[in-house]
A protein has these predicted regions:
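Intrinsically disordered, low-complexity terminal tails/loops enriched in metal-binding residues
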Residues: 2-14, 23-142
Length: 142
């Protein structure tokens, strides 16, 4: 039952990321005329990519925790928090919300923490990819 719920949640997250990506693509014509809008849309796209990477790493860590590898639990929690922050930031940036700067600060902090946790577990390609995505995201937000 727990695996079924996890799969359903993963599908919902993937669908929301696809919807956001389509929104970003459709808004590109407007962005071509407005440099600020172009930057906001670029940020939204990078946020959406990081969200997908963090959600994937969350799933990876959840599987490992299920196998008894408890050292992945903290990373698992940080990945899901980071994915949510990235999702919020992507949405607000795509809308060019006045609150996007606040979301970007929160996103940078979450990404830094997530990257640090993923980097602690060596020799795991999934976690290395998540750490890189988060580091790149945090750098862009600062």
């Amino acid at each position: 039952m727990q695996r079924r719920t996890m799969i359903m949640n993963y599908r919902m997250v993937s669908q929301s990321a696809v919807a956001l990506a389509l929104f970003v693509v459709s808004a590109s014509a407007f962005a071509a005329e407005n440099p600020h809008a172009a930057m906001m849309l670029k940020c939204a796209g990078v946020c959406a990519d990081c969200q997908v990477t963090c959600d994937s790493c969350f799933h990876h860590c959840a599987s490992l925790v299920g196998e008894g590898k408890k050292e992945h639990a903290k990373c698992m929690h940080l990945c899901v928090d980071c994915a949510e922050c990235c999702k919020l930031c992507a949405t607000l940036c795509a809308r060019q919300s006045d609150f996007s700067a606040i979301a970007a600060d929160c996103c940078a902090k979450c990404c830094d923490d997530c990257a640090a946790a993923c980097e602690k577990i060596a020799d795991d390609k999934q976690m290395a990819a998540c750490a890189k995505s988060c580091r790149d995201m945090a750098k862009m937000m600062k």
